[in-house]
Amino acid sequence: MSYRPILTLLIVTSCAALSAPGAFAQSKGEIRIAHVYSRTGPLEAYGKQTQTGFMLGLDYATGGTMTVAGKKLVVIEKDDQGKPDIGKSLLATAYGDDKADIAVGPTSSGVALAMLPVAEEYRKILLVEPAVADSITGDKWNKYIFRTGRNSSQDAISNAVAIDGDGVSVATLAQDYAFGRDGVKAFKEALKKAKIVHEEYLPQATSDFTAGIQRIVDAMKDKPGKKVILVIWAGATPPYGALAALDLKKRLGIDVATGGNILPAMVSYKQFPGMEGATYYYFGIPKNPVNEWLVANHYSKFKTPPDFFTAGGMSAAIALVEALKKTGGDTATDKLMKTMEGMSFETPKGKMTFRKDDHQAMQSMFHFRVKADPAFAWGVPELVREIKPDEMNVPIRNKR
């Protein structure tokens, strides 16, 4: 299907220094959506993909009209720069001064954790996309928080499916903040047979992995059986190149495994043919009308395929529009919450459902095996099988 280009949406951009109190007067004919994300900072690439997907998703879900129940959708964009204090302040400004009815974001788990209490203070929904840490819908959760993005447990359980086995020794290499630590914790809980022999945590902006990888090698080199390093890493300086340069498989029989990633990061996956893991999204995997629309329209508009976080942004937009359609455009928080709890909606990944217990979107993950295809600059994650929501016992970690 095809819709006319985006013409009718008003976008208001903001940074930390903008958005003076009362700068925007709310109209009854508008639905105001704040999108707080990393337009700059260490996760800039992720944030920009989310924004692209979100705008495409609004276009798709509204049939190109950018309205719901006769009300214009107004998106107020704010750059948190990947900094928790800025994200917290911007969300308060969005709810308070900009009169946002609902907010989406952020990119970083650290920023998200700072923003959660703001949603509770203003009693307005924050739809988290794409921040991953379990604690967002776990011990730090409040009832105003929904999430379309996957959580650490969904990453971990699906990767455990791909890696777990008798006699397998696993070392983890992760960033030393909420995303990395929650990811490792969830992965350890998900393993049934394999044993964790080492956990390595490095600063987010690490570019020299020599010492960290050496500690992993020292812990693993004499272990019998299959040996795997699981990488849990976000941002522009992933360790895959450093791992490939050491040729650990050939020298020491140590495999590398990881989840999906953005296409530029997956260029280094080409050095690991046969590597297995589980991904949230790769444009060539899901076969459904929503993904077909996304791929076709993204190619048409940008001459490239949609990336990992583009799908997440689109999923968040579809969820919002579907909820607003069901309320007849009513943005009252209580009505939206009742509508969204248990709500199912179609996304580029397939069907998602907001679990009533913690508002986490239950969704499929995709077990892949990397193929070095000369037609692509990146290692292609070929589908082994879809891991459906009912196969993953995703823990409920919050308290209501």
Language model features with spans:
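Solvent-exposed, acidic/polar segments of extracytosolic/periplasmic ligand-binding ectodomains
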Residues: I31, P273, E341-R400
